[in-house]
């Protein structure tokens, strides 16, 4: 039986989603151990988006297989019990057919990046948003996103060690919602290059600091060189929001 799960987690204290040889503090390994404890079955959990260390999730989706057919609420409650005290929660469980794959069946992935633009330090949002002290030019940032949306070669917007063979991606939606000190950047695509969202955010912030003009985004894309874009924004402001199937 295949189970589809929706997961929420605070990524602050984890090394990221993916299991690592020399650490037991990945979200994947902790989740697989929780499933083992209640089901007595070893299983692999496949995820829609492998988040990096420090990145959070509001609606991450994954799947795993068990030989037993259990009520979904039993699976949810049992996993959550064995996840204590980790900052990981199973929000929902669905039964699905074997054709469903959390990663390969995904049609669109949605991310949110949170910025707090103020001089005072963060308390409630500490490790959950990027604090930028100097006032940002929001209008410049909004103008810049128009050059990022759509289908482009995003070689300038990916990590130097990115293993993807094809740097061409389509950004379906990119918008900024600004409310007083809060700047929320929403971005959606079928898939992303490694660090692509965080580099886009870092580049938009350079526009907000008036270091880049909005039109300079065209030069960055044309260069196809990571050094032309802005910094990689910190992981703790990034949230995996949801997946469309």
Curated annotation (Swiss-Prot):
Keywords: Isomerase, tRNA processing. It is an enzyme of class 5 (isomerase). Its EC number is 5.4.99.12. Homodimer. NCBIfam families: hisT_truA. Formation of pseudouridine at positions 38, 39 and 40 in the anticodon stem and loop of transfer RNAs. This is tRNA pseudouridine synthase A. The lineage of its organism: Bacteria, Pseudomonadati, Pseudomonadota, Alphaproteobacteria, Rickettsiales.
């Amino acid at each position: 039986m295949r189970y589809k799960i929706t997961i929420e987690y605070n990524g602050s204290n984890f090394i990221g989603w993916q299991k690592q040889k020399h650490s037991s503090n990945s979200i994947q390994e902790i989740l697989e151990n929780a499933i083992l404890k209640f089901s007595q079955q070893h299983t692999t959990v496949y995820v829609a988006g492998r988040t990096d260390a420090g990145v959070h999730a509001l609606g991450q989706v994954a799947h795993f297989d068990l030989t037993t057919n259990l009520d979904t609420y039993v699976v949810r409650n049992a996993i959550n019990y064995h996840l204590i005290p980790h900052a990981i929660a199973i929000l929902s469980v669905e039964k699905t057919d074997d054709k469903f794959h959390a990663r390969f069946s995904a049609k669109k992935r949605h991310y949110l990046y949170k910025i707090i633009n103020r001089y005072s330090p963060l308390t409630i949002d500490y490790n959950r948003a990027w604090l930028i002290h100097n006032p940002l030019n929001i209008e410049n940032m909004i103008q810049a996103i128009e050059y990022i949306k759509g289908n482009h070669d995003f070689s300038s917007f990916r990590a130097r060690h990115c293993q993807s063979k094809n740097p061409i991606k389509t950004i379906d939606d990119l918008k900024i919602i600004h409310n007083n000190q809060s700047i929320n950047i929403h971005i959606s695509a079928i898939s992303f290059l490694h660090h692509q969202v965080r580099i886009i955010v870092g580049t938009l912030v350079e526009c907000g600091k008036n270091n880049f003009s909005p039109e300079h985004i065209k030069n960055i894309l044309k260069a196809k060189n990571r050094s032309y874009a802005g910094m990689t924004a910190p992981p703790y402001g990034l949230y995996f929001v949801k997946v469309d199937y």
